[in-house]
Amino acid sequence: INPKLNVTFEETLRHIVRQDPDIIVMGEIRDRLSAETAVEAALTGHKVLSTFHTEDSVGGLVRLINMEIEIYLVASTVSAVIAQRLLRRPCPACAAPEKPSVGALRRLGYNPSDVHGSEFKKGRGCPKCRYTGYKGRAAVHEILILDEHLRSAIINRKPPHEIRRTSIEQCGLVTLLEDGIVKAANGITTLDEERLVVSDSASARVNVIRFNREIGRAVQQECRDRGSIS
């Protein structure tokens, strides 16, 4: 992008659209201009991929609205928002089974019975991980797919916490916290990482206690699929 040479977002988009691409990938949406460009590209019928820096998936919708994009455009052009965090993996060379404390689980909105049969792990520290107990990273995701319930909430200008409640109660959104619990229960990451990276987000905890039984069953089923529960 070089405005002095007339290489602007709008001009570049016109040239890209003329090439009839299947997917348009844009850089980070930081301001109203880049947001409008992304929306205009989506209005041409093309699939547009871009990025935000937000706390969670609902934050992406809020960011577009705060950039003064028309509500009806946000509701009609956005198909999905994916939030992710990177959590450290326990070192495979020194990881050992760990039984999480009742207090640690309850601080995350869970009871021991919700994760019965899971295989939590924690690295003890070794030369291969430089005595950190961790090696590599794994992503936890929150995938918000817009349907008629969410589009209606956006058009009716519901506040962010109401949009998030709708996404959880009516659309079955699995939050970053819940996805992290499933991965921790399968030894992919640790509860310490979950608390450090994810659970500090207040919005990540909305309604999590209400859904802990359902997620607990999902954890146990995933463990069965992996052959960890006989």
Predicted regions and their residues:
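Short, flexible helix-loop junctions that flank or precede catalytic/ligand sites
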Residues: 1-217
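Positively charged, low-complexity/disordered segments
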Residues: 219-230
